[in-house]
Structure formats: structure tokens, C-alpha cells
Amino acid sequence: MLTKFNPTELQDIQNYYEQNGYVIVSKLLQESAIDNFLKEYNRFKARPFYVFRSQDTNQPELIRSNEQGFLEHSILDPQNLVFAKGFTSTVEKCITSTAISNLLKQLSGKDKHIIWQSMFFDKSTGTVAHQDHYYLDTDPAGHLIAAWFALEDIHPDAGCFFVVPGSHRGEVLERTASGFKDHEDFVSRTQQLISENNYQFKPCPLAKGDVLFWHPFTVHGAFTNINPQYSRKSFTAHFVPEGMNWRRQASLPEKVASSNPNVYFWKRDRLMDHLRFFKNYADFTIAQATKRKPKMEMRGIEYEQKS
């Protein structure tokens, strides 16, 4: 059974988060904002020959729906896509809502937050178990806050997000090489950590509008979809409290306010974004022709096949 809190139970939310390394808040997202996004998304995914960068393969992928009409790959930083204004504006309204910033303030004690990275999932990609700290975190560590937004009622067979409650108080794994060259070793070390501590995965089949927040040291991931008729439409976003230093980031770009003055994005060079869009076409074509493997694989099934 999932423990959930109403958005007004702020102190209980904070206490549960600090004790367990995650917390679920019921109906934090307005249904109208979700429905507006889904309407724009259905228009967006019908576009032919649109290439985006995927989080699960860390390379460009083509918009291509499966037999059930779901997009197989996650979209990295969907709010930054070009030639998709209706889509990106509805993404922004969901992940930067006042309800979200109020919860972030309660958890961090800071008024303002910056979005470091976000993703959209149509179908579960079966994300391998990990700690966010390896990829991105604050300095001093442990102040990043991540959130998973359910955009529909999530069926248990859809490839649920999972957490290991209390694992944020256990061992924290560090990156040991630049450019994520030790990523496969990190995945292996994480599996060893899970085994040695008998960590148990807690599935989180959220209801539409629920949001799950978690700590950067918390072990989490997503199960593989076991019933193709179920999608798992959801956002993930990572937030840094304003004024915090960022691990492994010597310099940071200028920040700009979103539609919510308490949530910021990094300022984008839109010319470069448009040029990168066309470069992604070339990279996708080359990857398909050469059968190039992803540099950093996030799909758990790929590691299961290797073992």
C-alpha cells in the first residue's frame, strides 16, 4: 500500500521525505494542465521525421509509435524542443506549477529552484536501478530534489517507477571516471549494493496528478513494461535550490524565469538549439546505418541481456 499525503500536509510531507528518501503527494498536478499537455502531445507525436534526444539511449531517436500507439523512447528535456511551441509550453506549465514550487520550498527551505534536467516518458523504458548522485547533484551533495509526475493512472504492469525506502541513508556511490566512462561499472556496483543490503524495490503505481519526490541518494528506477497495452505517461524533473553549487560544473549558464517566477530554466541559445536539431538528424542517420550502440545505456533490460 502506498503512503500518500495531501498537498496541504506540508510538515508531514517533509518528515516522511527526510525519513524515507521519497514522498508521494496526491493530486498535486491539475487535471486540466495534464489534459492540455496530452492533447498537444498527441499532435506532436503524429509529426513525421522529427528527431529528438532520448534519455534512455543518450542519442538521437526518431518519433515512432509502436503498435499500441506509444513512443518507445523517453524525450530528454522536452521543454527545450524546437519547432514544437504548443508542446513545450504545456510541458513547462506542468513541471513549473505553483503547487510544485510550494512543495520544493518545503523540502529544501529555499524559495527558488532551477530545473537541471527533465524527461517525458510515454512508455516505461525500464530504467536501471541507480542513485541520481552519480549523474547530477549539488555541492555539498544531497540537496538535489527529483520529481516524477504521473500524467495518467499508472497500471502495475506498465513498468512502475520504484524506490528503495531509506536507501538515502546508506552507501552513496561516486563517479570514478570522466564522461561517464565508468557507467557500466556503476550499474554493477549498484546491483552489488542492492544485493549486499537486501534492498527491496517498492513499486509506485501513482494516480493521475500524483507527484513523487525523491532524494539524490535514494536508489530508484523503473520496472520493464510487462503488458504492452499499458502506457506510463509521466514526466521526471530534477531541481536544484537556488544558491547551491553544482557538482562537476565549473561554470553555469545564465538562468531565466519560467512562467512561475520561483522556478528557473537555463537560458538557451535558440540558434544553437535549431542547429543541433538538424545535427541530430545526421547523427540519427549515421547511428542507424552503422548500428552504433548507445554510449550510456539506461534501460535495465540491456544489462539483463549481458548478464
Task: Enumerate the predicted regions with their spans.
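Non-heme Fe(II)-dependent double-stranded beta-helix
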Residues: M1-Q19, S26-A129, Y135-T138
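Short edge-strand/loop segments of extracellular domains
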Residues: K123, V164-E171, R232, H238-M244
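Short, structured patches in soluble enzyme cores that scaffold and shape functional sites
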Residues: M119, Q131-H133, F149-D153, P165
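A short beta-loop-beta micro-motif enriched in histidine and acidic residues
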Residues: D132-L144, Y199-Q200, L206, Y230-S231
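Short catalytic/ligand-binding loop motif for oxyanion handling, primarily in non-cytosolic enzymes
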Residues: A33-D35, T125, P156-D157, E171-V172, ...
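Short, conserved beta-strand element in jelly-roll/cupin
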Residues: T138-P156, P205, F213, H238-E242
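Double-stranded beta-helix
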Residues: N15, I154-V219
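Non-heme Fe(II)/2-oxoglutarate
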Residues: L2, R47-V51, Q55-N58, N66-F70, ...
